[in-house]
């Protein structure tokens, strides 16, 4: 509890409040209160969170992979940029729709949050299970809708909606590691700082996904999500390079979360700009 005292000046017309703020440790973000406040695994609230993850992952994979299928079957009308925009918009919309319950939709994000003590470890298996189920159901739906049955693994006929390297395995691994780490860093930043309002979280995360798909899509497929790669692999039986899309995004997301945890919080960081937006240093004084 803060210590508040009241005193008057000699003239009796000024009141001074002396407030002793709580220690910084009490207000630092992120907190670890999830250990005591997380719902029981069989509670209605936890089941609602799992349903949100299932539905959200389903629509995420359905929309993003449908854009890929339409682009392949209709003379590349969607284009790479269009596909990237679809992925970004669908994740943005889902964050706004389901974020009040749960909006991971990605096993790498779930594991990264757990590794940084921002998510209960005992809920991880259930989350990953429903995320993979949602991705698999979406992939099965797309297979029926677009009749993608003809030798998709070889890419000689129908397009494979899963993830596969365009170049070497090493190139794809490094790319997935980097872009997923960047995505996770953004997720942690916008969800723990007071500078970002809740109204902007979905927009910023969606924009990050769009950016990653634009420059990494032709290299690794820009999966950033093990569930996004597992679902199509299970439905079509194509597992070439699947280890890349299980390991690289997970390690990348964990590294992104740990990097954010090592950085100073907004309360402790030395301000680079003043409240008016002007720099404390002249441009010529900044290191190049």
From Swiss-Prot:
Domain of life of the source: Eukaryota
Modified residues (Phosphoserine): 278
Keyword field contains Transport: yes
Record InterPro entries: Aquaporin-like (IPR023271), Aquaporin_transptr (IPR034294), MIP (IPR000425), MIP_CS (IPR022357)
Gene Ontology terms: biological process: lactate transport; response to hypoxia
Alphabetical list of SUPFAM superfamilies matching this protein: Aquaporin-like
GO molecular function: channel activity; lactate transmembrane transporter activity
Record's subcellular location: Endoplasmic reticulum membrane
A GO term from the CC aspect: endoplasmic reticulum
Modified residues (N-acetylmethionine): 1
Keywords noted in UniProt: Acetylation, Endoplasmic reticulum, Membrane, Phosphoprotein, Repeat, Transmembrane, Transmembrane helix, Transport
Motif (NPA 1): 106-108
Transmembrane segments annotated in the record for this chain: 50-70, 77-97, 126-146, 170-190, 202-222, 234-254
NCBIfam families (alphabetical): MIP
Family in the record: Belongs to the MIP/aquaporin (TC 1.A.8) family. NIP (TC 1.A.8.12) subfamily.
Protein task: Low water transport activity in yeast cells.
Name of protein: Aquaporin NIP2-1
Protein source organism: Arabidopsis thaliana (Mouse-ear cress)
Gene that this polypeptide is encoded by: NIP2-1
